[in-house]
């Protein structure tokens, strides 16, 4: 299992991330949202069109690696539409009654946000189909031969589902989302803007180079950038006069064992396992998981995406392969095949 205090783990939310300062860091409207330009442009059109027609926005599926702002986007959609948002997650909705209670309390055009929607149970998913398509809720009354089905009308609403594993959704559920949106890793420029904005909310002095250095080591992920910013702030307040510069950011992040590529101990452990234990690969996912003592799902969902996107690992039909860039990162000469 990945350590709970892994600084760059994007799917762990720190306790202080739900406090007021973190809520203030989140953009409230699309104009405040940084990055994901294509997604933002599409959403503006869809929201304005729905508002002109006086209708609920079409159901929306937001997918991509953890920490890229899926929850934030759902809240922005509700704010832009001027409606309420009710939030839950797939594992929490164990029974059909859990979902029915949420649906029957929605006001017209409200947003229902379901995180980890790929983890919905089949019985809950079945209830969701008519609710999404016809705004109706099918409920069974009674048991056995006396059981009967009744239909309850629901107000028009927008379901926003979020997932890191879009492929794990069943085809019938995936087909019912009219607006699929994929979030990509952020570039350094956009991330540095997010770091600068967050520092302002925290009343922290930071120069452009300091923000860029934190952004460079944040794995393209805003959640990680904000987490690293907090730790750099601690370092700056204790070791220096509180202002974050490039040198201070470098010192702090080096001390935290986050290297220039944004890798920590687990990333390096995975790459070195492929290079040293499996001679650069290919290696199957199960063997790799056993070699580093990690679950295969964690490798697939948390560790691999950024390493693949940055060109350190290749995924082939025969398994994972370390690329020349991975060898170069550790100053290891790649053997000739």
Swiss-Prot record:
It is an enzyme of class 3 (hydrolase). Residues 4-186 are annotated as: Large ATPase domain (RuvB-L). This is Holliday junction branch migration complex subunit RuvB. It comes from Shewanella pealeana (strain ATCC 700345 / ANG-SQ1). Homohexamer. Forms an RuvA(8)-RuvB(12)-Holliday junction (HJ) complex. HJ DNA is sandwiched between 2 RuvA tetramers; dsDNA enters through RuvA and exits via RuvB. An RuvB hexamer assembles on each DNA strand where it exits the tetramer. Each RuvB hexamer is contacted by two RuvA subunits (via domain III) on 2 adjacent RuvB subunits; this complex drives branch migration. In the full resolvosome a probable DNA-RuvA(4)-RuvB(12)-RuvC(2) complex forms which resolves the HJ. GO terms for molecular function: ATP binding; ATP hydrolysis activity; four-way junction DNA binding; four-way junction helicase activity. Disulfide bonds: none annotated. Has 3 domains, the large (RuvB-L) and small ATPase (RuvB-S) domains and the C-terminal head (RuvB-H) domain. The head domain binds DNA, while the ATPase domains jointly bind ATP, ADP or are empty depending on the state of the subunit in the translocation cycle. During a single DNA translocation step the structure of each domain remains the same, but their relative positions change. It holds the Pfam family RuvB_C. Its EC number is 3.6.4.-.
């Amino acid at each position: 299992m990945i350590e709970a205090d892994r600084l760059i783990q994007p799917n762990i939310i720190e306790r202080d991330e739900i406090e007021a300062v973190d809520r203030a860091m989140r953009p409230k409207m699309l104009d405040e949202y940084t990055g994901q330009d294509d997604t933002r442009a599409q959403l503006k059109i869809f929201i304005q069109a729905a508002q002109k027609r006086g209708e609920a926005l079409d159901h929306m599926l937001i997918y991509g690696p953890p920490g890229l702002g899926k929850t934030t986007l759902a809240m922005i959609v509700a704010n832009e539409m001027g409606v309420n948002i009710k939030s839950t997650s797939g594992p929490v909705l164990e029974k059909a009654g859990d979902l029915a209670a949420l649906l029957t309390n929605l006001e017209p055009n409200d947003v229902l946000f379901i995180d980890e929607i790929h983890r919905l149970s089949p019985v809950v998913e079945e209830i969701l189909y008519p609710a999404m398509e016809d705004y109706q809720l099918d409920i069974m009354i009674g048991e056995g031969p006396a059981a009967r089905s009744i239909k309850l009308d629901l107000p028009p609403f927008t379901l926003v589902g979020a997932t890191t594993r879009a492929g794990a959704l069943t085809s019938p559920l995936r087909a019912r989302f009219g607006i699929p949106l994929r979030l990509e890793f952020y570039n350094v420029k956009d991330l540095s803007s997010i770091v600068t904005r967050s520092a302002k909310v925290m009343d922290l002095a930071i120069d452009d180079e300091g923000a860029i250095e934190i952004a460079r080591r944040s794995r393209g992920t805003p959640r990680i950038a904000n987490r690293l910013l907090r730790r750099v702030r601690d370092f700056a307040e204790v070791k220096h006069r509180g202002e974050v510069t490039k040198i201070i950011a470098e010192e702090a992040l080096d001390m935290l064992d986050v290297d220039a590529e944004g890798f920590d101990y687990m990333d390096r452990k995975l790459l070195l396992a492929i290079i040293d234990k499996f001679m650069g690969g290919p290696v199957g996912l199960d063997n790799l998981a056993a070699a580093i003592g990690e679950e295969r799902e964690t490798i697939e969902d948390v560790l691999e995406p950024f390493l693949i996107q940055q060109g350190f690992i290749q995924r082939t039909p025969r398994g994972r392969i370390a690329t020349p860039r991975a060898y170069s990162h550790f100053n290891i000469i790649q053997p000739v095949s």
